[in-house]
């Protein structure tokens, strides 16, 4: 059976909704928080001591990563897309790529069984 890696870079405040949407669909997932710069509007930040405001160089984002067998890809991608959607530029991007093999370190299982 073939496997796919799904990586979704989303707005930081959507991680809870995305987590809730996929937690019962996948064996596990990882969320990495970071900063990103894309098409969305960046936050305006007030300077210290009333010195004015400036536009942040980056937005707070999160990348949700999981590996699933081919049969689950469409459902997981749709769930992430629906949960992360606001209709504004900067909602994020979902990338799906092929995974040749996976190995569970603790159980020594390989392929889809490792998931």
Map each language-model feature to its residues:
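Positively charged, small/polar-rich N-terminal and surface patches that mediate targeting and assembly
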Residues: 1-115
């Amino acid at each position: 059976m073939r496997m796919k890696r799904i990586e979704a870079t989303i707005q930081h405040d959507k991680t809870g909704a995305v987590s809730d949407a996929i937690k019962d669909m996948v064996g596990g997932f990882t969320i990495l928080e970071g900063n990103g710069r894309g098409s969305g509007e960046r936050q305006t930040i007030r300077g210290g001591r009333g010195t004015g405001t400036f536009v942040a160089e980056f937005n707070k984002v999160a990348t949700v990563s999981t590996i699933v067998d081919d049969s689950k890809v469409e459902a997981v991608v749709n769930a992430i897309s629906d949960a992360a959607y606001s209709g504004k530029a900067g909602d994020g991007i979902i990338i799906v790529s092929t995974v040749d093999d996976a190995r569970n370190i603790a159980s020594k299982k390989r392929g889809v069984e490792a998931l």
